[in-house]
Structure formats: C-alpha cells, structure tokens
C-alpha cells in the first residue's frame, strides 16, 4: 500500500553506476531481486560483495514507484497525455538518449508523476464541459415593503441581523428574534423607493396578501435580468415625472412674471394718461385687481418697470422709523400732479419740486440720539466695523509688552492704600472705581471689597496670580504695594474671592 514513508525510503539515491558491462551477475552471494512479474531470481551465495551491477539497481529503484502508481489508481495514460514534458522524455528514452542511466531517469520520472499525478489528472480538457462552483449567496427576506439580506448572528445568539439589499448605499438595518421570528428593531430608514408589485411577484409573493411586521423568506429565485429591467423602467418613469414637474414650475413662473410685467406697465400707462404718478396704495390695489389670478413674484422686476415705487417705499420706511407717519401727512407731502410739457419727452417723467417754496418744504427729520453705551448700538459688533476692531485688537496684543503678574512695589509705602477696582465680568473692557483703605491689612481690604460688591465674603480672600494659581493674602504683601494700581475682583465662587492684578502699563 502507498504511504509517504515507503515512498521516501524507496526513492533514495541509488549507488553510482559501475564501469563493468551489463552482464548476468557472477557473484557467489547475489541478493534476491523480485521483478515486475513476481518471479524471484536467486544467485549463488558468496562470501564477499565487491560491486552491484546497474541493472539490478535500476530494477529495484523502478519497481517501488510503479507499485505505488498502480496502488494509487492514477491513470498513467492521462498523465502522459496531458504532460508534454513526459512525452518528450519518453521519446528520448526510447531513442536511447539517456544512455546507461535509463532506469534511474525513469524512476525519477515515475516518482515525479506520482507526486503530481492528481494535479495532472484534475486538469480539464479543452473540449470537456465546465463544472462551475455554485456562488455563495445570502438568505433574502421581504418585510414591510423592502427586501433585506442576512448579515450575521448576534453575539448573544438570540437575534438575527438583517441589512438592506442595497447595502452599499442604504444604511437600513433590521433585528429579528431567532425563536419567535418577530421584528425587534428597525435602524435607519431606507433612502430609496420601495420595490413595486411586479418585483415582489418575481419572488413568488402576492403583494395583496402581505402582512405588515412579518418576515417572508424569498431566497434568490427571481430572475436578476428581469428585475433589472423593471428597476430601470421605474427609474425612467420617476425621472420623466420629475422633469415634467420641473417644466411645469418653470412655465408657471414665466407666466406669473409676464402677468406681473403686464400689470405694472398697465398701471404706469394709466398714471401717465391721468397726468400724475399714483401713490403706492393705489398702485398696489390696481396691481392686485389686475393680477388676481397670477400673484406677483418678482419685486425687482416690478421696481425696474416703476422706479418711483422704490423711492416711495424708502420714504415711508424712514417716516415709520421716525414715528412721523400718518396718512394725512403722507398725502400732504406727496409730489404734485405735473402736466406733460412736450410730446417728445421720455416716457418716464421725473417730477421736479421747488424746495425753496415754503409750501413744498419737507419737514425736518428728527433722529434719536444713539446711545453708545447700549449693547444694541455697539460699534464693535457692527458687521461693517467688526473686521477693523478685530485687526486693531490683534495688533494691540502684538505691540503691548508682557504683563506683570504682581503689583508694583515701593520702598516708601504709605499707611493707607489707594487702588482702582472693578468686577471681573469676562469682558475685555472694565470700568474701574477708586478705592481707599486706611490701614494695609486683610481685614480692612476685605471690608472695602464687601462694600464695593454689596455682598458678604463667607470664605477666604485670595490673590490670583494666574487663572489656576492663587495665594493667600499676608501682611508683607500689602505693605510693599504701590498706590494707584488696578485690580479685578472675581466673586463667581462665594466660598473664595479672588483679587487679580491688571498691569496698566502693558495694556
């Protein structure tokens, strides 16, 4: 029987060929050699062995691979037929191309054929039919109007995870219970339209008898080409409907614009015939009556046809802001009716008024004083000036020096301590108030700070060196500080107040 161990022992390298001729053995004790037909040849025994003829070695080396090939069941004719190298070697061996080493060469060839025989036989002929391996497919189900494919089993081994059949573009997911087969969770919504009834019928389902929140196993029995055709037809119909709606909207917009232009021109022509320019209320009522079926949509086009409406609108808005708008006053100061001077004048008549006349003098416009302290009128937040202030703030940060963390000290301190104080409200600018304490100690300083804030400090009073570093007040610290310096008081934490120094020379 064939085994890897027997093959390795039988194909060991044989002894080198001797220079003697290939005659019958003449040794006294020649070994027994079994040929292919099963007969045993025995020579006379001898006391010494000097050499082994090549014929005996070749027969012994060749018989083992042959027996292994026969036992393995490999069709040698197919191996030789499908291997051009073996055919060439056999032709060379039959012609005597190997010389005295023909047995050794054939043994190696048979051993190689035994090692690669299964591969050679497994090769498909050019004329033989192709046997394709079935493609691995996923289970498909239909639920709530969409097709889902199996994704994986949950880690708890209690749920099935399903994903949309268009997994590359749609994130919809579904979880079902393994035992009850009920839908547990829906994750995300489908970003595409649901399949039509024709697609559902391809999978053997009746769209009229499908229950909601139920999973129907459909498999992959539908014709993919047929479904692609259906999907393409649906996509073409949706695209055509979308184009039709867009064309209808464009046509409707054109009609509305045209009707607005016609109405504006009619109003302007009527005003020119009457010899006066109508008021804004008259124009609006006329336009509303002439274009009731097609409302105006383009205000810029209307103002282009009737420029005086823009001036009327601006004048009315200014008067409303100044709280001076009344119907009587507005009609009193309207432009007077001017007759047409000549027939060659341009269609658009701009009325002229005599501003020197007292009857035509416009009322003085009263404006409210702008409160610069009001946050609503802060110029720093104005869109026009904000970039300038931002640039100035950045330049100021670049030009100013590094601020000091500690107040300036003096060698001749006074008994009293004068300083400027402000609350830290988080803004960039602060209003400082002058303060004075008669004695330089923590008690008097704390009392002055409480009077300034109107609150009681229930905790400690600290001196802030940085946003994260604070130290407690001590007497030598207060004794060496110079007068007329600036400080910020932070009372956001009632348990500890922080007094921080502001370097006025670096600001």
UniProtKB/Swiss-Prot annotation:
GO biological process terms, semicolon-separated: negative regulation of DNA-templated transcription; nematode larval development
Molecular-function GO terms, alphabetical: DNA-binding transcription factor activity; sequence-specific DNA binding; zinc ion binding
Pfam families hit by this protein: FLYWCH
Record bears the keyword Metal-binding: yes
Composition-biased stretches (Low complexity): 1-26
Family annotation (Gene3D superfamilies): 2.20.25.240
Knockout-associated phenotype: Knockout, in a flh-2 mutant background, causes poor coordination, egg-laying defects and dumpy appearance. Causes a ninefold to 10-fold decrease in lin-14 level in embryos and about 2-fold increase in the levels of micro-RNAs lin-4 and mir-241. Despite the increase in lin-4 expression, post-embryonic heterochronic defects are not observed. RNAi-mediated knockdown causes precocious embryonic expression of micro-RNA lin-4, exacerbated by simultaneous RNAi-mediated knockdown of flh-2.
ZnF region ranges: FLYWCH-type: 135-192
InterPro entries: FLYWCH-type_ZF, Znf_FLYWCH
Function: Probable transcription factor. Binds to the DNA sequence motif 5'-[AG]GGCGCCG-3' in the promoters of target genes, including micro-RNA genes, in order to repress expression, and acting redundantly with flh-2.
Annotated protein name in UniProt: FLYWCH transcription factor 1
């Amino acid at each position: 029987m064939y085994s890897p161990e027997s093959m390795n022992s039988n194909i060991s390298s044989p002894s080198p060929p001797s220079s003697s001729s290939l005659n019958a053995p003449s040794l006294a004790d020649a070994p027994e050699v079994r040929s292919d037909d099963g007969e045993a040849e025995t020579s006379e025994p001898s006391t010494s062995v000097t050499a082994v003829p090549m014929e005996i070695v070749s027969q012994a080396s060749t018989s083992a691979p042959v027996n292994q090939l026969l036992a393995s069941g490999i069709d040698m004719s197919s191996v030789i037929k499908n291997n051009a190298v073996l055919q060439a070697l056999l032709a060379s061996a039959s012609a005597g191309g190997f010389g005295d080493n023909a047995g050794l060469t054939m043994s190696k060839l048979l051993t190689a054929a035994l090692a690669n025989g299964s591969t050679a036989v497994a090769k498909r002929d050019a004329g033989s039919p192709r046997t394709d391996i079935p493609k691995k497919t996923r289970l498909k189900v239909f639920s709530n109007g969409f097709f889902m494919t199996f994704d994986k089993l949950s880690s708890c081994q209690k749920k099935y995870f399903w994903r949309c059949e268009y997994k590359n573009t749609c994130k919809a997911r579904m979880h079902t219970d393994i035992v009850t087969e009920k839908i547990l969770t829906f994750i995300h919504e489908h970003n595409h339209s649901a399949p039509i009834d024709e697609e559902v019928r391809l999978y053997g389902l009746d769209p009229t008898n499908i229950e909601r929140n139920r999973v129907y196993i459909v498999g992959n029995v539908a014709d993919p080409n047929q479904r692609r055709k259906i999907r393409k037809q649906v996509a073409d119909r949706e695209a055509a409907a979308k184009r039709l709606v867009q064309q209808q909207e464009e046509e409707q917009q054109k009609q509305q614009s045209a009707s607005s232009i016609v109405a504006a021109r009619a109003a302007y022509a009527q005003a020119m015939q009457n010899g006066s320019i109508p008021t804004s209320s008259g124009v609006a009522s006329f336009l509303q009556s002439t274009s009731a079926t097609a409302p105006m949509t383009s205000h810029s086009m209307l103002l282009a046809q009737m420029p005086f409406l823009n001036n009327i609108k601006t004048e009315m808005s200014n008067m409303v802001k100044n709280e001076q708008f009344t119907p009587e006053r507005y009609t009193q100061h309207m432009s007077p009716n001017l007759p047409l001077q000549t027939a060659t004048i341009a269609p658009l008549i701009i009325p002229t008024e005599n501003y020197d006349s007292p009857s035509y003098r416009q009322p003085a416009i009263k404006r409210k004083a702008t409160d610069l302290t009001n946050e609503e009128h802060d110029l720093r937040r104005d869109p026009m000036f904000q970039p300038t202030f931002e640039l100035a703030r950045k330049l100021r940060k670049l030009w100013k020096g590094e601020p000091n963390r500690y107040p300036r000290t003096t060698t001749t301190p006074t008994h009293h301590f004068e300083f400027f104080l402000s609350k830290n409200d988080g803004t960039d600018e602060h209003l400082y108030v002058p303060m004075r304490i008669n004695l330089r100690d923590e008690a008097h300083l704390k009392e002055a700070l409480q009077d300034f804030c109107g609150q009681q400090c229930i905790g400690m009073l600290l001196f802030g060196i940085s946003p994260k570093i604070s130290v407690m007040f001590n007497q030598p610290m207060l004794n060496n500080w110079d007068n007329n310096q600036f400080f910020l008081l932070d009372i956001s934490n009632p348990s500890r107040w922080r007094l921080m120094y502001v370097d006025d020379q670096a600001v």
